[in-house]
Amino acid sequence: MTLIVEAKQRLDAFSLDAAFTSERGVTALFGRSGSGKTSMIRIIAGLARPDEGRVVLDGEPLTETTTGIFVPKHRRRFGYVFQEARLFPHLSIRANLTYGRWFAARTAHGESFDHIVDLLGIETLLERSPAKLSGGEKQRVAIGRALLSSPRLLLMDEPLAALDDARKAEILPYLERLRDETDIPIVYVSHSIAEVARLANQVVVMRDGKVEATGPAIDILSRPSTASDRREAGALLEGTVESFDARHHLSTVALKSCQVHIPGAALAPGKSVRIRIPSRDVMLATTRPEGLSALNILEARIDGMSSTEDGTVEIRLDCGGDIILSRITTLSCERLDLRQGRAIFAIIKTVALEA
């Protein structure tokens, strides 16, 4: 699947001028509120027309302003999941789900009802009414209804934004299964770096109506400039679970040439995972420290340094092929005599499991 999007649009004081190409998997449109993410997804869906541009899916033009092509939204065969579930209150969950079948093309061979129900863990909800469901359950049903329409592309516009942290944690594993167990490409809009780090294969960073960066999630989310808030800056790494220590509730994850220990998560050996290490949680030492509670102390070499306007220094660390980031004060940098190429020890206070 290849999706090509090019769009220019003037909306009152806001100007959109953005383009990207998406391949199979999950492509995240990431950025602050007001950056143009929802405007882009509405153009993809056929809910809005750009002043100039095109939307092409697998070589088929759906919108093309130069030739006047505009395929109506109901003929694009796209599934759309909004911030709110938008279920029919007078129908049971089963009826809400089967309603999606009415929009499937006659020749479409989509996922079966039973498979979607199992995939999203909603077997016990089928005879209930929407009023009896939690926010996370409603969103899972909304996703199931979209999938049962046999979409060529699934568009998800901030689907977790209205949920609290507990409900987000409930639904994220189901979105991972959706990504891993179906062949349906997804365009996922979010301003949450944690959601994007966990789900996305490719990231399109938007700012002020323009595409600022695009590429693999591992690369894009490890750039300090990607974070909308400096507290979110950090490195995203991929690894494999080596073991789980049941006594201490610690999983050991192997990276390219080192290991990290993650508390709390009972992960199966051999499982591929993503971990995120915030730059604010990486301390530096010129000699190996002793007598610390930190479990993860990695040998590294300084691969790059850049000063910021607020009196801090962003330091890029090469840990045997895995790149992590540290943010320290300019004073600390001077006292430690840090410089390009110097060997250093990185003390990691927090490792977040993303997938």
Curated annotation (Swiss-Prot):
Select a single GO molecular function from the record's annotations and give it. Answer: ATP hydrolysis activity
Q: Which UniProt keywords apply?
A: ATP-binding, Cell inner membrane, Cell membrane, Membrane, Molybdenum, Nucleotide-binding, Translocase, Transport
Source domain of life: Bacteria
Question: Binding positions for ATP?
Answer: G31, R32, S33, G34, S35, G36, K37, T38
Pfam family of this protein, just one? Answer: TOBE
How does the UniProt record describe the way this protein sits in the membrane?
A: Peripheral membrane protein
Positions of transmembrane segments: none
The residues covered by the Mop domain are 291-355
Q: Where is the ABC transporter domain?
A: 1-233
Give, as one word, the top-level EC class.
translocase
Q: Name one GO cellular component term.
A: plasma membrane
Subcellular location(s) of the protein: Cell inner membrane
InterPro entries, per the entry? AAA+_ATPase, ABC_transporter-like_ATP-bd, ABC_transporter-like_CS, Mo/tungstate-bd_C_term_dom, ModC_ABC_ATP-bd, Molybdenum_import_ModC, Mop_domain, P-loop_NTPase
According to its UniProt record, which reaction does this protein catalyse?
molybdate(out) + ATP + H2O = molybdate(in) + ADP + phosphate + H(+)
State the EC number(s). Answer: 7.3.2.5
Entry annotated with the keyword ATP-binding: yes
- Which family would the database say this protein is a member of? Belongs to the ABC transporter superfamily. Molybdate importer (TC 3.A.1.8) family.
Oligomer and partners: The complex is composed of two ATP-binding proteins (ModC), two transmembrane proteins (ModB) and a solute-binding protein (ModA).
What is the recorded function of this protein according to its Swiss-Prot or TrEMBL entry? Part of the ABC transporter complex ModABC involved in molybdenum import. Responsible for energy coupling to the transport system.
Please state what the protein is called.
Molybdenum import ATP-binding protein ModC
Q: Which organism is it from?
A: Rhizobium johnstonii (strain DSM 114642 / LMG 32736 / 3841) (Rhizobium leguminosarum bv. viciae)
Its taxonomic placement starts with: Bacteria, Pseudomonadati, Pseudomonadota, Alphaproteobacteria, Hyphomicrobiales
Q: Which gene encodes it?
A: modC
